[in-house]
Amino acid sequence: MELIDNKALKITVPNDIVDRITTTVEKTRVLDAREHLTDLLIHWGPDELTHLNSIVTFKFPLPSPLAHNYKYTGRWVPFTHQKTTSEFLSINKRAFCFNEAGTGKTSSVLWAADYLMNLGIVKRVLVICPLSIMTSAWKNDIYNTCLHRHPGVAYGTGADRRAIISNPQYEFVIINYDGVRIVKDDIIDANFDLIVVDEANAYKNVSTTRWKTLNKILKPHTRLWM
């Protein structure tokens, strides 16, 4: 794996997956085909690497262009592990984040989302979290991390929640676990590009109403970070 001029990524893959990569990942070119392996040149963009990650499991993580092209915003200087987390999320459509408590996962998620929003890949984000931290953690962290973004807390009556969800002014919409069921159809209509679930443990049982509701609001194109 080699990064060339911060524009393209050169990788070597088995021949049996070359066709799948070249037909799925845009801006891919075959450099050299040998008996068992092929060298490919792929445009170094988040969309291309996200597609590539969905096809191939690499021994080492792919380098995210976020590392080169994103200026971290907000009050805090990110730690190395936060940068690594943001880079990982930015090029994985469906991902788990198992960082320990207190390591700044929320900021890592927000920076990755902000990067994709800057590129127009993500327009709106739905954050599903415990009721107790909707404002104290998520809304406040957005103000501290992404001052230029507009968060809305979807809480209260059904009408109150719908007003927040349907308003495109709110780039980040924060809602509690059980509130999702109340406005499920409105969430589907709002067409969120990215759904963030704080604490995947709340959705570990596929037989629960929570899990079934989440499954219904997910679309094939929706990013999901848990």
Predicted features along the sequence, with ranges:
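Catalytic metal- and UDP-sugar-binding loop of GT-A-like glycosyltransferases, i.e.
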Residues: 224-226
